[in-house]
């Protein structure tokens, strides 16, 4: 039996931790734009997305965990040859997500899973003027500190443009694909 005189995770302590995290993200983070993926056409048999679009961008503060450069940078041998991925990890506040972005995304009919950031959505980072695709969302880290989770950790890779329609209304993002870059690389292959 647990000691009844020591209460783990009172609402006041949880709110204090969440406020401290929000304050740190505002001080040490950067403003990024979260872009939810909208599904236009989908194959009903294998549930493959045939066509998708990004029609809105929501600013939110995020902390970049690996300022030293891209993460592990594993070199993969794919069917098209050797491929090197460029990965970044962003940390965003769960409370800011639930209060600011979730109500806006929930009202969109062609967006799925509005309760948290989801894999396949995009993050626009103005520091490098690049788009990153969310590959994995860690929503239980740190693991229930004071019996609550406070942040989402987004593991992202440099976005490779295929057939997506990107028209967010934010000129910095929309011009990103009209200039020299389509997948984060110039036409000559330099990053």
Regions found by a protein language model. Name each.
Residues 74-89:
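Acidic-enriched and Gly/Ser
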Residues 122-145:
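Short beta-strand and beta-hairpin "edge-sheet" elements
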Residues 110-125:
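Short coil-to-beta transition motif at edge beta-strands of beta-rich domains
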Residues 89, 138-156:
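Short, solvent-exposed secondary-structure boundary/capping segments
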Residues 88-113:
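Short alpha-helix capping/helix-loop boundary micro-motifs
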Residues 1-74, 191:
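Active-site-proximal polar cores
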Residues 152-191:
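Glycine- and charge-enriched low-complexity intrinsically disordered segments
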């Amino acid at each position: 039996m647990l000691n009844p005189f020591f209460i783990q995770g009172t609402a006041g302590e949880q709110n204090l931790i969440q406020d401290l995290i929000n304050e740190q993200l505002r001080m040490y983070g950067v403003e990024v734009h979260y872009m939810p993926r909208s599904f236009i056409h989908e194959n009903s048999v294998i549930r493959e997305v045939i066509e998708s679009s990004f029609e809105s961008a929501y600013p939110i503060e995020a902390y970049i965990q690996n300022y030293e450069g891209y993460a592990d940078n594993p070199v993969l041998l794919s069917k098209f040859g050797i491929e090197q991925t460029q990965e970044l990890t962003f940390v965003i506040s769960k409370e800011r997500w639930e209060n600011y972005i979730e109500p806006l995304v929930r009202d969109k009919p062609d967006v799925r899973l509005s309760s948290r950031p989801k894999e396949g959505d995009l993050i626009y980072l103005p520091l490098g003027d690049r788009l990153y695709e969310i590959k994995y969302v860690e929503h239980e880290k740190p693991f229930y500190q004071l019996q609550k989770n406070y942040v989402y950790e987004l593991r992202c890779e440099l976005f490779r443009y295929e057939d997506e329609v990107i028209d967010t209304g934010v000129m910095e993002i929309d011009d990103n694909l009209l200039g020299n870059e389509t997948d984060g690389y110039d036409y000559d292959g330099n990053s």
